[in-house]
Swiss-Prot record:
Superkingdom of source: Bacteria
Cellular component terms (Gene Ontology): cytoplasm; ribonucleoprotein complex; ribosome
Chain's gene name: rplU
Name of the protein this chain belongs to: Large ribosomal subunit protein bL21
Complex and partners: Part of the 50S ribosomal subunit. Contacts protein L20.
Lineage, uppermost ranks: Bacteria, Bacillati, Bacillota, Bacilli, Lactobacillales
Assigned protein family: Belongs to the bacterial ribosomal protein bL21 family.
Function: This protein binds to 23S rRNA in the presence of protein L20.
HAMAP family per UniProt: Ribosomal_bL21
Single GO molecular function: structural constituent of ribosome
Swiss-Prot/TrEMBL GO biological process terms: translation
Keywords: Ribonucleoprotein, Ribosomal protein, RNA-binding, rRNA-binding
Length: 104
């Protein structure tokens, strides 16, 4: 059974494994640099360790592959019979991280 971990980043929890590429909320790190996630909620595998609320001393290390933006989401509001309408677009920024190691 391969080792996996659940980390907290960007207000979300993400399940990661070594070698996996994950998309997380934007991190202020340049492409090619290493990033360390200290908020590890669970480390699974042969012996599963569940944190209360975090696993003490556990870290997940990854390399930032790229920064980008998701596809545009368009919102449109209008009020009937009033001639009032509003169109707005939004592109959420993300960071693609390749997981290098899970240290438990």
């Amino acid at each position: 059974m391969s080792t996996y971990a659940i980390i907290k980043t960007g207000g979300k929890q993400v399940k990661v494994e070594v070698g996996q590429a994950v998309y997380v909320e934007k991190l202020n790190v340049e492409a090619g640099q290493e990033v360390t996630f200290n908020e590890v909620v669970l480390v699974g595998g042969e012996n599963t360790v569940v944190g209360t609320p975090l696993v003490a001393g556990a870290t997940v290390v990854g390399t930032v592959e790229k920064q980008g933006k998701q596809k545009k989401v368009v919102t449109y509001k209008y009020k009937p019979k009033k001639g009032s309408h509003r169109k707005q677009g939004h592109r959420q920024p993300y960071t693609k991280v390749v997981i290098n190691a899970i240290n438990a």
